[in-house]
Amino acid sequence: MQTLLKIFLGGGLVLALSRPGHAQQTPPDPATHATLSDPEGRPPDSAHIPFVLPKDIKWTGDPKRQETAVLFGDQSKEGPYGVLIKWHPGAFSRPHFHDQTRWIYVVSGTWWVSSSNVYDEKTTYPFHAGTFSTDVANTVHWDGARSGEKEPAVILLTGMGPVKTVQVDENGKPLPPRAPAKE
């Protein structure tokens, strides 16, 4: 648990430092005059310090609704994982729960969350950038970004896999799995 929290906090710090605008606020190094946006020298050895620059993050999904970028691990397999989720304004999940506890850090924007079994945007609560949250195992919730937001909500989601997600009805009872889409 402590190791996972260190991974989470370390990943969150790296992401927070790589947010747009941070480089302009960082004063140059007095010895080299380098800034985060204009580094001098070579990047760290990736065998010692693996890294992915923001421009190299691979986003998948619907750019009008929800996009996902896997940073490390795989939530369908055993072990730790870290995923960025980008909720575009007006996009929400449906009520569901996960069988494993997960930890969330809001990187940017406003992430709207509800613990209601009923899908109604009026029951969501805003978690602004910088908010940390725990998604307790087997508790119903749903989340996304409200219509009218000026930017997507980006969250860093971490946990231990494998994790199973179960959609629920308005009574909180599991729904049967959806049939695969036909081509």
Task: Please place each PLM-identified region on the residue numbering.
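Double-stranded beta-helix
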Residues: 48-50, 134, 142-183
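Sec/Tat signal peptide C-region and signal peptidase I cleavage site
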Residues: 19-23
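Bacterial N-terminal signal peptides
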Residues: 6-16
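A short, N-terminal "cap"/entry segment at the start of jelly-roll beta-barrel domains
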Residues: 25-81, 170-183
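Glycine- and acidic-residue-biased ligand/ion/polar-headgroup-sensing regions
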Residues: 88-91, 98-118
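Conserved short histidine dyad/triad with adjacent acidic residue
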Residues: 78-98, 127, 136-138
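Short acidic-glycine-tyrosine-enriched beta hairpin
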Residues: 76, 111, 117-139
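Short beta-strand His + acidic residue motifs that chelate non-heme Fe in jelly-roll/DSBH
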Residues: 93-95, 113-114, 135, 140-148
